[in-house]
A protein has these predicted regions:
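Helix-loop-beta element that forms the nucleotide-linked donor phosphate-binding surface
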Residues: 40-51
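Metallo-beta-lactamase
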Residues: 5, 90-101, 120-126, 186
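Short active-site oxyanion
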Residues: 24-30, 95-97
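Cap/insert and terminal regions of metallo-dependent hydrolase folds
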Residues: 19-20, 30-32, 36-39, 106-201
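Acidic/His-rich segments in extracytoplasmic proteins that coordinate ligands and/or metal ions
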Residues: 12-24
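Short, flexible loop segments at the rims of nucleotide/cofactor-binding pockets, characterized by
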Residues: 9-12, 75-79, 99-102, 138-143
């Protein structure tokens, strides 16, 4: 998604190693992170760790709220859940974007929808859900939504549009690699969305937040 003027970059969690983080440009940028991850950004000038429901006002038009997700954190055998995980709600110029990082489905999204909805645009994972027999089901994962669960979350958030992400880049699970976007599109109407408001992008494809959010 192209950068909107005044709206900074959101880096989807890519299991970044410390070397990659050190090589990011713009060391004077404001960095917003879940709790206990600031140690990886020591060379940055403005690092802000956030607990669930913390809000940070970046400027007069931009506010970010860190919200719960149904997931976990782990980088080694000894640090399970030692850092926080979650979703970012970005409020910009009167519009709301929910950037759902890795998450499973849960009732928390009904609560988030009641408190913060309606959401204008939701980004949510739709792939990496078949880990059978490591997990008991072939079609769902506790920590990654399948396409239908992603749409149910977007429905609970009262989202106007939803973008499916976290699919088709790396083979992490056993579902066919092109299954998530097909199911995502096919299930749109069932969850109250027009097909044109359920969006899928190819690797390297660009779009404009201004267009997606309906800014004139």
């Amino acid at each position: 998604i192209q950068r909107s003027r005044g709206l900074g970059d959101v880096y989807k969690r890519q299991h970044q190693d410390a070397y990659t983080i050190r090589k990011f440009p713009y060391k004077d940028a404001k960095v917003l992170l879940p709790l206990k991850l600031g140690k990886y950004f020591r060379r940055y000038k403005d690092v802000n760790e956030m607990d669930w429901y913390d809000e940070i006002k970046v400027n007069e038009k931009l506010k970010v709220t860190f919200l719960p997700a149904v997931h976990w954190s782990k980088r080694s055998l000894t640090d399970t859940n030692k850092t926080l995980w979650g979703n970012f709600l970005i409020e910009y110029d009167g519009k709301k974007i929910l950037f759902a990082c890795d998450t499973g489905i849960g009732d928390i999204y009904k609560s988030i929808g009641q408190k913060y909805g309606p959401i204008d645009l939701t980004f949510i994972n739709i792939g990496a859900y078949n880990f059978y027999p490591i997990m008991p089901y072939k079609d769902k994962s506790i920590y990654h939504t399948n396409p239908e669960e992603a749409l149910e979350i977007a429905q609970n958030l009262k989202s106007k549009k939803v973008v499916g992400m976290h699919w088709g880049t790396f083979v992490l699970s056993l579902e066919p690699i092109m299954e998530p976007p097909k199911r995502f599109k096919a299930s749109a109407n069932k969850y109250g969305f027009k097909k044109e408001d359920v969006l899928i992008y190819k690797i390297g494809e660009f779009d404009s937040l201004k267009k997606l959010l309906g800014h004139n």
